Amino acid sequence: MAGRSGDRDEELLKAVRYIKILYQSNPYPKLEGTRKARRNRRRRWRARQRQIHQISERILSTCLGRLQEPVRLQLPLLEKLHINCSEDCGQGTEKGVGSPQISVESRAVLGSGTKE
């Protein structure tokens, strides 16, 4: 099993070469002809680009063995989020949600608010 990651790297490089060839096979349309003809060429070019992008995703997901859907990030409920601001908000008393608690010096970052 010593050479396994090298084999996988070779497969990935081969997949990237294939994807590069796909994108090179669809150059941007020429800027000649009537406005309608140019618009139609650009529309067809964008449709081909979308197809190439989808094919590229399928090639990479097959090569890397990744899932189609990204893993959903668990976010806290909006009702639980709040900004804790006492009478003197400029002293960096804001608290974040969760740990670690990070103090932010808002005056140092934002300045006094006047332009010189």
From Swiss-Prot:
Record-level GO BP terms: mRNA transport; viral process
Give residues where Phosphoserine occurs: S5, S99
Question: What's the source species for this entry?
Answer: Human immunodeficiency virus type 1 group M subtype F2 (isolate MP257)
Chain positions covered by the region annotation Homomultimerization: 18-26
Q: Where is the signal peptide?
A: none
Q: Which Pfam families match?
A: REV
Motif Nuclear localization signal and RNA-binding (RRE) boundaries: 34-50
Provide the family line.
Belongs to the HIV-1 REV protein family.
Name the segments for region: Disordered: 90-116
* UniProt note: domains: The RNA-binding motif binds to the RRE, a 240 bp stem-and-loop structure present in incompletely spliced viral pre-mRNAs. This region also contains the NLS which mediates nuclear localization via KPNB1 binding and, when the N-terminal sequence is present, nucleolar targeting. These overlapping functions prevent Rev bound to RRE from undesirable return to the nucleus. When Rev binds the RRE, the NLS becomes masked while the NES remains accessible. The leucine-rich NES mediates binding to human XPO1.
For this protein's source organism, the top of the classification is: Viruses, Riboviria, Pararnavirae, Artverviricota, Revtraviricetes
Molecular function terms, GO-annotated: DNA-binding transcription factor activity; RNA binding
What are the entry keywords? Answer: AIDS, Host cytoplasm, Host nucleus, Host-virus interaction, Methylation, mRNA transport, Phosphoprotein, RNA-binding, Transport
User: What is the annotated role of this protein in its UniProt record?
Assistant: Escorts unspliced or incompletely spliced viral pre-mRNAs (late transcripts) out of the nucleus of infected cells. These pre-mRNAs carry a recognition sequence called Rev responsive element (RRE) located in the env gene, that is not present in fully spliced viral mRNAs (early transcripts). This function is essential since most viral proteins are translated from unspliced or partially spliced pre-mRNAs which cannot exit the nucleus by the pathway used by fully processed cellular mRNAs. Rev itself is translated from a fully spliced mRNA that readily exits the nucleus.
Know the name of this protein?
A: Protein Rev
Q: How is it modified after translation?
A: Asymmetrically arginine dimethylated at one site by host PRMT6. Methylation impairs the RNA-binding activity and export of viral RNA from the nucleus to the cytoplasm. Phosphorylated by protein kinase CK2. Presence of, and maybe binding to the N-terminus of the regulatory beta subunit of CK2 is necessary for CK2-mediated Rev's phosphorylation.
Q: Where in the cell is it found?
A: Host nucleus, Host nucleolus; Host cytoplasm
Whom does it interact with, and what assembly results?
A: Homomultimer; when bound to the RRE. Multimeric assembly is essential for activity and may involve XPO1. Binds to human KPNB1, XPO1, TNPO1, RANBP5 and IPO7. Interacts with the viral Integrase. Interacts with human KHDRBS1. Interacts with human NAP1; this interaction decreases Rev multimerization and stimulates its activity. Interacts with human DEAD-box helicases DDX3 and DDX24; these interactions may serve for viral RNA export to the cytoplasm and packaging, respectively.
One GO CC term on file: host cell cytoplasm
Concerning InterPro entries, the annotation shows:
REV_protein
Does the record's keyword annotation contain Phosphoprotein?
yes
Q: Which domain of life is it from?
A: Viruses
Q: Which segment of this protein is annotated as the motif Nuclear export signal and binding to XPO1?
A: 73-84
Q: What else is known?
A: HIV-1 lineages are divided in three main groups, M (for Major), O (for Outlier), and N (for New, or Non-M, Non-O). The vast majority of strains found worldwide belong to the group M. Group O seems to be endemic to and largely confined to Cameroon and neighboring countries in West Central Africa, where these viruses represent a small minority of HIV-1 strains. The group N is represented by a limited number of isolates from Cameroonian persons. The group M is further subdivided in 9 clades or subtypes (A to D, F to H, J and K).
Q: Which gene encodes it?
A: rev
